[in-house]
């Protein structure tokens, strides 16, 4: 399964990149908009979600636990400096996907113990 982590370039915006990844067969999209205001992330998520659904792809938000439900996302990816996985699980419940950044075996063990998927 291919995963696409969105990014912005002057020639290809977030949605265009997501669209191209989905058309190329991607089945997992992570909307990553570091330092963007929540309103902008939510607006982009509302545009990306139907594209993901149309292509049968999972849609994951980067960092924004508080926007997952409103955006209709399948889950969230948490970086090492974001909310701990166990706190996010309390907010999102058992049915949402929670992933995290793991660069070492110790990171993997920690994330697993906290309840990451």
Description of each model-found segment:
Residues 1-85, 90-105, 110-117:
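Conserved N-terminal beta1-alpha1 strand-loop-helix module at the mouth
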């Amino acid at each position: 399964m291919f995963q696409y982590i969105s990014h912005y370039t002057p020639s290809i915006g977030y949605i265009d990149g997501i669209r191209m990844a989905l058309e190329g067969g991607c089945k997992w999209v992570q909307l990553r908009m570091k330092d963007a205001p929540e309103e902008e992330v939510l607006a982009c998520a509302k545009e990306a979600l139907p594209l993901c659904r149309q292509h049968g792809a999972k849609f994951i938000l980067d960092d924004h636990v508080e926007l997952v439900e409103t955006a209709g996302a399948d889950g969230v990816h948490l970086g090492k400096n974001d909310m701990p996985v166990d706190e996010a699980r309390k907010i999102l419940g058992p049915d949402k996907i929670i992933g995290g950044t793991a660069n070492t075996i110790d990171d993997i063990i920690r994330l697993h113990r906290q309840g990451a998927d």
